């Protein structure tokens, strides 16, 4: 029996972070057709499992708890699946990493398609994307991360910060190889972390299933079309 119900569009993008955390922890979950998600999303807030504007939304089938907003879901899963570090500082840094990842994908999609990518906009954005990569890289290096070993916030095993960071860069680089090239130039340790985690059976299987289900899809819509015209 599935452990969770995940409401997210049939694309990787923001939902992929939640899928990765569940897969890494060996959990099973249901997903739903886009029409079903739209129905849940548009319901009166008094009738929603948790009042929310848009997906992802997760329901823990064991407890009935419902959570929306990607960072909140990630931290809930980290807490309940024992994927968070012990110290208050490292938990706060975990949340920072998750929030940073959320910011990066928003910027990659021009804040959800506020406007479309053009060659000039991409040229202007590339240094900023490189800086984002170096922010993740410096975070890891301050905690002993190298291209071949270690974790983003130190410790002996991967946690929410590692899984989210690896998923951010692995998914973007897989869909847009030029992003992978930029990552190798700016954040070799993070690139190594993503390779190592996505070589593990749980995440390797997730990547394969994602490819089978969604093909080359990343975020969908006109914004993805503009990304594919320009980010190459």
Residue spans for each PLM region:
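Long, amphipathic alpha-helical surface segments
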Residues: 201-203, 217
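GST-like fold's C-terminal all-alpha helical module
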Residues: 89, 96-199
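Active-site-flanking alpha-helical
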Residues: 78, 168-169, 207
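GST-like domain detector, emphasizing the conserved glutathione-binding G-site
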Residues: 1-127, 224
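Acidic/histidine-enriched, glycine/proline-rich intrinsically disordered or flexible terminal extensions
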Residues: 210-232
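Exported/periplasmic ABC-transporter solute-binding proteins
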Residues: 203, 209-210
């Amino acid at each position: 029996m599935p452990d969770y119900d995940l409401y997210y569009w049939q694309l990787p993008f923001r939902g992929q972070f939640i899928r990765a955390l569940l897969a890494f922890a060996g959990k099973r979950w249901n997903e739903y057709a886009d029409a079903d998600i739209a129905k849940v999303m548009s319901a009166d807030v008094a009738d929603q499992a948790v009042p929310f504007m848009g997906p992802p939304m997760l329901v823990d089938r064991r407890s009935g708890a419902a959570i929306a907003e990607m960072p909140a879901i990630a931290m809930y899963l980290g807490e309940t699946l024992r994927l968070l570090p012990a110290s208050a500082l490292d938990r706060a840094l975990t949340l920072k990493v998750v929030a940073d990842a959320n910011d990066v994908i928003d910027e990659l999609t021009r804040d959800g398609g506020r406007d479309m990518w053009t060659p000039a906009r991409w040229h202007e954005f590339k240094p900023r994307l490189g800086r984002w990569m170096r922010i993740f890289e410096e975070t890891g290096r301050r905690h002993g991360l190298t291209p071949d070993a270690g974790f983003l916030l130190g410790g002996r095993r991967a946690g929410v910060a590692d899984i989210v960071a690896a998923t951010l860069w692995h998914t973007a680089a897989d869909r847009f190889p030029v992003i992978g090239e930029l990552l190798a130039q700016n954040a070799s340790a993070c690139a190594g972390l993503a390779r190592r985690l996505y070589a593990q059976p749980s995440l390797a299987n997730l990547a394969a299933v994602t490819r089978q289900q969604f093909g080359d899809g990343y975020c969908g819509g006109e914004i993805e079309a503009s990304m594919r015209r320009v980010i190459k």
